[in-house]
Amino acid sequence: MKANIDVFTLPIEKQFMRRLIKPDTWILNGFVEDCAAPHPHVVIGSEKAAVIDTTDLFYNVREYVEKIVTDKPLITISTHWHGDHTKNNYECEDCDQYMSQRCWEDIQENRV
């Protein structure tokens, strides 16, 4: 039997597992079992870092990235409008956010 993990009570450095897939490119994995779920990717550039798909599965992905992965300013890139890819964009409202025009229109239309 697997123990349930309450991610909200974990210290920020234990809320995710990060995997370096190539230099300056990370995949963040949260505690989601038996689920085909989107995972944020972080690509670190010379001046900024991009969070690709903030998702809806993680608690405070921005805080984690800023404290554990990089101290560079962040931008977000949304691949498409589905909430499981964009819900946590609100954490980065003061960051530059990139998405297609269609994605922006779909987010506006489907905003709850």
For each of these PLM feature ranges, what is it?
Residues 8-11, 24, 33, 77-81:
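Short amphipathic alpha-helical surface micro-motifs
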Residues 2-23, 94-112:
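Metallo-beta-lactamase
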Residues 14-67:
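Conserved beta-strand hairpin/beta-sheet module of binuclear metal-dependent hydrolase folds
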Residues 61-112:
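Active-site HxH/HxHxD metal-binding segment of metal-dependent hydrolases
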